[in-house]
Amino acid sequence: MDRAGRLGAGLRGLCVAALVLVCAGHGGRREDGGPACYGGFDLYFILDKSGSVLHHWNEIYYFVEQLAHRFISPQLRMSFIVFSTRGTTLMKLTEDREQIRQGLEELQKVLPGGDTYMHEGFERASEQIYYENSQGYRTASVIIALTDGELHEDLFFYSEREANRSRDLGAIVYCVGVKDFNETQLARIADSKDHVFPVNDGFQALQGIIHSILKKSCIEILAAEPSTICAGESFQVVVRGNGFRHARNVDRVLCSFKINDSVTLNEKPFAVEDTYLLCPAPILKEVGMKAALQVSMNDGLSFISSSVIITTTHCSDGSILAIALLVLFLLLALALLWWFWPLCCTVIIKEVPPPPVEESEEEDDDGLPKKKWPTVDASYYGGRGVGGIKRMEVRWGEKGSTEEGAKLEKAKNARVKMPEQEYEFPEPRNLNNNMRRPSSPRKWYSPIKGKLDALWVLLRKGYDRVSVMRPQPGDTGRCINFTRVKNSQPAKYPLNNTYHPSSPPPAPIYTPPPPAPHCPPPAPSAPTPPIPSPPSTLPPPPQAPPPNRAPPPSRPPPRPSV
């Protein structure tokens, strides 16, 4: 299948890959609850079918079957290779699950026999890896080799050489040794000692290492954060997955971005951990561009593919949000202006409301006990005896006498009766069916409700204060206008009495009054008006014509003398 078909199959598995975001450990779990791997790479099983495993081939088959079912990525390809005197490829590299099922059936029918030529199996694997790389795919490869015996010196040399050749092509080599194996030989054939899985308890114990093999051999990419970026902006991506430190050298780990299935850009990560990578990402300038995320464990020699796609979108600079907030604040300001403007522009005079009528103490419905006050027999006030006036009882309050008692003078022989109980508790009210109303139990939210009610009352009072001041329909008024009135004659500042020796002193400003009209001498009893004092140096007030007085009606107006 070509690369485009493989990518299409990977896109179909996008929904499956999204489920692993909630999984932990080695990547995820299958429907039956067992561990699973979602990595997209090429997996090669190289199995020993020499005569030493003749009676244990069923255990080997079930081990391979269980392990193969744990790799469930649609992008994973698998191949079965057996070796004895020579190597045979039972199933070539494929991701077709039906072909994998048929390959497992062929594997079950294998009849073991022959010598242990492990290098023959590595040769068959290297041939396929080389062919796939020549096609331009460069997919990461994982080899799991199983044997049960010790290799002779020459066979060990050839096996190590072919394993190194597979590594040079980008493969990661794991070895499984059963019972009578040489662990030192397998450590040199595999990538390291950590890549060797010993099974000392025989072939029956192969099922117990499936989880360990899956955890160490699985290299998977589960997610990328962020998955959507802004076009034309630089960013960093966090690659979530497993097995990123399984490489022989973590310094050779690379993040790869395949843009629109055409251009591949490799970036060295800032941090490499077993479960995540922190990588710089290339700048995608156009909206709608897509970058498929890949990881290389060998400095770009081969890549582990995934279904994780990073897309670009258009991002605003925040101006729309700023404009929206500005419009919102303007609307709020207009609403406040509409509410408070009539308070500034309308003068309203309202009648003083009548004083509130004080409620009687007897009508107190708060349910609190009422205090009893001493009573005084008022028959002894001013009546000179018991039959003097009508008997009247007066209640004395805690701040002195009540209004009735304040009008009377307490007599010496007044009888004061103290109440038996200081407080009088109200009787419980009965319902229509003569049943008493049960007291409401205190809820857990009662304190919170009380505080909220108090806050609501405070806000309501503030609203009512402003609402009362607002003009009602029909109220009239006008705004206060401040205007400047221009005077026709500017005011003159009075002259100061400053002495200038070079100039003569100015003459006092004085205008003699007009001659008084001739009037008959007044009666002797009338007092003589005082003589006006001479004017001072200050300027006199502005002269105005004397007011015209109307003559008495009993005599004609006087004539002026000639």
Swiss-Prot record:
Cytoplasmic side: 341-562
Lineage: superkingdom: Eukaryota
Presence of keyword Transmembrane: yes
BP terms from Gene Ontology: actin cytoskeleton organization; blood vessel development; negative regulation of extracellular matrix assembly; substrate adhesion-dependent cell spreading
Compositional bias ranges of the Pro residues kind: 502-562
Consequences of knocking out this gene: Antxr1 deletion results in viable mice which reach adulthood without defects in physiological angiogenesis. However, histopathological analysis revealed an excess of extracellular matrix in several tissues, including the ovaries, uterus, skin and periodontal ligament of the incisors.
Signal peptide: 1-30
Assigned protein family: Belongs to the ATR family.
Name by which UniProt lists this protein: Anthrax toxin receptor 1
Organism listed in the record: Mus musculus
Lineage per the UniProt record: Eukaryota, Metazoa, Chordata, Craniata, Vertebrata
Gene of this entry: Antxr1
